[in-house]
């Protein structure tokens, strides 16, 4: 009787796993159908503000979900290749354009390893209509702190995910499994 879910894949859930493992998918994360076409231009990054021009170049009015991903440095710390950081839906008439603005926060660059830390490295700001349909990108160099890879990472499933991780490898991340869940009794609550 298992009363909890073990997400041993950790940060590699959904599109993050498939991209890191190099596995193709039929419908990438963020995929959607539209009756028109959109063009992305003029990606600008100033300080932590990201702007992009989106134009409806089709013959019909339509909506587009503009998605901003952050491509992480792959220098030893275990991280997805890219992560969704923001999105905005715009509705545009044929020929109409809109400037979409995103603000990057420090947490968009951070990992949790003995607290929130921002690793030094080259990141890429990616803008597109899905995780697989990236239209524009621009590199950003971040000078923060050198975050060493955990000693257990080398050679583990998390360094190069494929298939499923073992519970033993998962324990290295979690330090120990969750406590056994107890059967709930009507009228009782945990603190």
Per-region residue spans from a language model:
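Short flexible coil/turn linkers enriched for glycine and charged/polar residues
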Residues: 58-62, 94-96, 132
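Secreted, periplasmic, or luminal enzymes acting at the cell surface/secretory milieu
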Residues: 1-63, 69-70, 120, 125-128
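Intrinsically disordered, low-complexity Pro/Gly/Ser/Thr-rich segments with frequent PxxP/GP/PP motifs
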Residues: 76-113
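Compositionally biased low-complexity segments at domain edges in trafficked proteins
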Residues: 150-188
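Short, hydrophobic/aromatic beta-strand segments
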Residues: 61-68, 80, 111-114
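Intrinsic-disorder/low-complexity, polar/charged segments enriched in Ser/Thr/Lys/Arg/Asp/Glu/Gln
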Residues: 47-49, 97-101, 135-137
């Amino acid at each position: 009787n298992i009363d909890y879910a073990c997400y041993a894949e950790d940060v590699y859930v959904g599109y993050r796993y498939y991209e890191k493992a190099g596995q193709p998918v039929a419908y990438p994360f963020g995929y959607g159908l539209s009756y028109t076409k959109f063009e992305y231009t003029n990606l600008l990054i100033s300080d932590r503000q990201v702007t992009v021009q989106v134009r409806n170049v089709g013959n019909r009015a339509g909506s587009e979900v503009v998605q901003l991903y952050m491509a992480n440095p792959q220098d030893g710390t275990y991280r997805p290749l890219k992560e969704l950081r923001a999105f905005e839906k715009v509705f545009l008439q044929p020929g109409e354009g809109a400037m979409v603005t995103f603000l990057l926060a420090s947490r968009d660059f951070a990992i949790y390893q003995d607290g929130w830390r921002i690793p030094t490295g080259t990141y890429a700001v990616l803008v597109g209509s899905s995780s697989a349909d990236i239209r524009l990108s621009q590199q950003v160099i971040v000078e923060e702190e050198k975050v060493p890879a955990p000693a257990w990472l080398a050679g583990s499933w998390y360094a190069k995910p494929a298939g499923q991780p073992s519970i033993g490898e998962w324990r290295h991340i979690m330090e120990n499994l969750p406590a056994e869940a107890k059967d709930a009794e009507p009228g009782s609550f945990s603190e």
